[in-house]
A protein has these predicted regions:
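Active-site entrance/lid segments in N-terminal catalytic domains of soluble metabolic enzymes
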Residues: 6-230
Length: 230
């Protein structure tokens, strides 16, 4: 808004702040930091001061530089925007969709559920040719298939072989050896003994107890069995 909006033109000696609502946030059009603070404070009015109090276009600050949304999400998944497109099964969330989102700094999940492994492999070929191997982040869907364990185990082995770092896990009612294997295979010991988990799992859950299960450490007996198997 121009500083003179809704008021008579002020003399040059009158401070600009006196023309704004008393509880409004002020930001000059050429001050990125002030614009960021003002725009993110959505509960208060924002008055943008133009040069000389005149009307004109205000330069929009790119969303990425505003830092809007979850900073933790962006840091956790290495993306520029806190935006995530979930997996739509049978390739509806296609390789092209994953690539388009990834190149724009968003996280997208390949809809691998319901696809044979050779089609998932072909999709990974296309995605990693565009986004790189273990470079620009993307996810792949893994659906729990109790009637056909080979689908789940084959998917996990493929993801480990191809260095897929994010899996979107669907329809899991419990933690299985295969989803635990994917997670623990990416564990490393970092500086100062800190545990680093390269492989991340996004659980799609429908009940709070399933969310709690996903947040717990993996069952010790499953981990022990996996270690025994090498």
């Amino acid at each position: 808004l121009p500083a003179s909006s809704g008021a008579a033109e002020a003399p040059a000696s009158v401070p600009m702040a006196t023309l704004a609502p008393t509880n409004a946030l002020k930001a000059r059009a050429n001050d990125d930091a002030a614009l960021r603070r003002a725009i993110l404070s959505t509960e208060r009015d924002v008055v943008v001061e133009m040069a000389g109090g005149s009307e004109g276009l205000v330069r929009a600050v790119p969303m990425a530089s505003l830092g809007a949304g979850s900073q933790a999400f962006m840091a956790q998944y290495g993306v520029q925007y806190p935006l995530y497109t979930g997996a739509m099964a049978k390739g509806i969330a296609s390789a092209d969709m994953v690539i388009a989102a990834g190149l724009k700094g968003m996280l997208a999940s390949l809809g691998a559920g319901g696809l044979p492994l050779h089609r998932v492999t072909a999709a990974l070929d296309k995605i990693q040719a565009a986004l790189g191997v273990d470079k620009m982040p993307f996810a792949v869907n893994l659906i729990h298939a109790p009637a056909d364990e080979g689908l789940e185990s084959g998917g996990v082995e493929l993801f480990l072989k191809r260095q897929v770092r994010i899996v979107e896990a669907s329809a899991f009612m419990k933690l299985t050896p295969w989803i635990v294997r994917y997670r623990v295979c990416g564990l490393e010991r970092g500086a100062g003994g800190k545990t680093i988990a390269k492989n991340k799992v996004i659980f799609k859950v429908s009940r709070t107890e399933l969310a709690e299960l996903a947040m717990r450490p993996p069952p010790a007996d499953i981990v022990a069995k996996l270690l025994k198997q090498g």
